[in-house]
């Protein structure tokens, strides 16, 4: 994991010296969870390959075990803008890493005399978490000015090396390119 992040940082920093379109956006849902701010840049021009780095806030709850989670994440994405003018098909792959606080009420069946009694037990803490996502969307982006994006991000979470969650996360983004 550290090698992947280190390689990503080396590649993106080497490319920053080239002329490219950059944008800053307010992101709602998608890889941001609830909301986030991201910086996007093309490797060259206003289309083709680029990257997206952000800061996001996520919050979620579950109903079966009174589960809740919230925290700050850093979405990283490599993407491709297909289209020559201002309208683009966005295709991308990425990962969100973050620190999250969680709490859960689980119900444990007791032993011995309490065999039929269900006792609530609360678990809480802070943990590092991550997910992987794809990006399929539309982006309106001029070389300078208003930018808008909308789409779907198929998202996968893991536990002990196995997929334990998958969602189709819609997203919206509004910002400015420069």
Regions found by a protein language model. Name each.
Residues 1-22, 178:
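Bacterial Sec-dependent N-terminal signal peptides
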Residues 13-22, 29-34, 85, 160-165:
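Generic structural signal for short, solvent-exposed loop/turn connectors between secondary structure elements
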Residues 19-73, 175-177:
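Short glycine/proline- and aromatic-enriched beta-strand/turn motifs that initiate or cap beta-hairpins
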Residues 66-178:
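Outer-membrane beta-barrel transmembrane domain signature
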């Amino acid at each position: 994991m550290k090698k992947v992040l280190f390689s990503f940082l080396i590649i993106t920093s080497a490319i920053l010296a080239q002329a490219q379109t950059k944008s800053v956006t307010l992101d709602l849902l998608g890889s941001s969870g609830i909301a986030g701010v991201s910086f996007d840049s093309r490797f060259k021009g206003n289309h083709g390959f680029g990257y997206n780095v952000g800061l996001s806030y996520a919050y979620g709850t579950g109903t079966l075990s009174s589960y809740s989670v919230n925290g700050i994440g850093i979405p990283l994405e490599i993407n491709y803008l297909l289209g020559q003018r201002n309208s683009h098909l966005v295709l991308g792959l990425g990962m969100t890493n973050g620190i999250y606080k969680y709490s859960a009420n689980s119900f444990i069946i007791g032993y011995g005399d309490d065999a039929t009694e269900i006792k609530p037990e609360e678990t809480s803490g802070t943990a590092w978490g991550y997910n992987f996502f794809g990006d399929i969307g539309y982006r309106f982006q001029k070389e300078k000015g208003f930018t808008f994006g909308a789409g779907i991000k198929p998202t996968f979470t893991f536990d002990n090396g196995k997929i334990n969650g998958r969602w189709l996360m819609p997203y919206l983004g509004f910002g400015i390119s420069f």
